[in-house]
Amino acid sequence: MGMKNKVTIALVLGLLLLVLGCRADSSQQLKQQSVKPPITVNQMGKKPVIVILIDSLMDKPLQEAIQEGRAPAMQYLLNQGQYFPHVVSSFPTMSVTIDSTLLTGTYADQHHVPGLVWYSNQKKRMILYGNGAKEALKIDQLQVFLDAIYQLNQVHLNKKTKTIHEELADKGKESASINAIVFRGKTKHALKVPDFIANSNRVPEKMIVTGPKWLSYAALAQLNPKNNWNTPLWKKFGMNDEFSAKDAAFLISQKKLPDVTITYFPENDNLAHRKGPTQLKGIEKADQALQTVLNAYGSWEQAVNNAIWIVMGDSGQSAVYDDRQAATVDIRPLLNHYRIAKLNQPVRTEDQIVIAANERMAYIYAINDNVELSDVVKFLQNEDKLDIIAMKDGKNNIHVTKGKTGKLFSYHPGGKFIDEYGQSWTLSGEEDLVDIKVNNNRIKYGKYPDVLARLHGAMNSHEGRYVVVTVQPGYELVGESSPTHIGGGAHGSLHEKDSLVPLIISGTNTRPKTLRIVDIKDWILQLVNE
């Protein structure tokens, strides 16, 4: 491989970290100050809604950061409002799927974004919105760029499922998206593609997308002209907390803040992946960025009086054991009876299995008609570290088992059993496999929050015959060149460690209908329209 190609790949990989929400440098210490005139509520007399989405924010480390005085802005908003430590995320617990749920108010069966990595039966290829460097070096870099930046929002995200930006536009209201990886709206924008990518002749110099009225996306689109300082390579091309904060503050200071602003702070996720879920540095940096946004109002008191603040995580993380051999569960040896497709070449007619690993969960596809999903499940059951193994039959029943057990649990939507969110189900078999308890036809969830609806969402998220598998806490699933986080943190599974996130609400006494990310969109629309 020539040096020029190596440099290009390195740069493209840097841009692909946009989706992963990885670490960027940010040396500025941000302190509370009163330097700008206060901003009042919008022309209709209603408070604008500002959503701060902090990647991999979790309750326990947040509480610890507050106790140590390292998160004063979040502490201030918490003290001025409401705090909910355990809000249920989407599944898989990967940012692209969760953000699609946040924006559409649906699970993956309706929004059709299955995970960070999945296989398209229609295109006969893997879809990667970004992933580890080893994995990415084996695939088409420019295709990953196109999938992550364009296809995700304009093609893969179900057009029949409206985003919050689209619904607001339909009502004549405005919104903003700042560094959010899912942003589809109704206003056309031209994303400026870096020259080293546009020169490939496969990617246009300007990429036309639809988003909200105000769209900011790292080096590809900025609101604040001075924010170029935060877009160099070593700052992940602008996919960092400081960039997000500066663009949000710019809207406030210029009195252009729309009805709803969704701002994404990515850096905590990478620090949690590397240092483990108990690290506090990422929370401290996110809080410093939040201070920048609050300061744009002149004072924090003015900020709370003149806006509704929603600060939340998207997924949790589970600590990964620090011994590589013990911590990783390689799926390939379990399925060595089959011909498994290779990452670095197109799927061949003789291939039988495709593996799409998403950290602590994976989709395992049977792409050959002679492969029975039930046989794939039996081979997977030989690994006792596998937590949930699920497949769907021809009648849309979902069957669940796990490693080293002969137990089986089956279910489908509709029926006499009602869960704590008002959803109805038909159940049979060993309920302890999904840790639910049933009493008088009422379902209570255990360590897998909202497991029936979330798993059903993934099992019906896209075309194809596939098995969904998750791994127990402490472990990660790997396929060919999958990224690992040995001694750090990982997410992706249905387990509560991956699935529960905190929510801070300030500026309103209301809350979502249920404490699930899937219900936050409708609540925000109510706040804007009431």
Language-model segments: residues:
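Active-site-proximal N-terminal segment of extracellular/periplasmic enzymes that hydrolyze or transfer
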Residues: 24-82, 93
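A long, amphipathic alpha-helix that forms part
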Residues: 238-252, 259-261, 268-309, 319, ...
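C-terminal motif of bacterial Sec signal peptides marking the signal peptidase cleavage site
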Residues: 18-21
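His/Asp/Glu-rich, glycine-adjacent segments
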Residues: 26-27, 106-107, 112-273, 429, ...
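Acidic/histidine-rich catalytic neighborhood
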Residues: 304-305, 313-366
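Active-site neighborhoods of enzymes that stabilize oxyanions during catalysis
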Residues: 160-161, 350-511, 517, 521
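Bacterial N-terminal signal peptides that target proteins for export
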Residues: 2-10
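Short, structured active-site-proximal loop/turn typified by the sulfatase FGly-forming signature C/S-X-P-X-R
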Residues: 63-117, 174-176
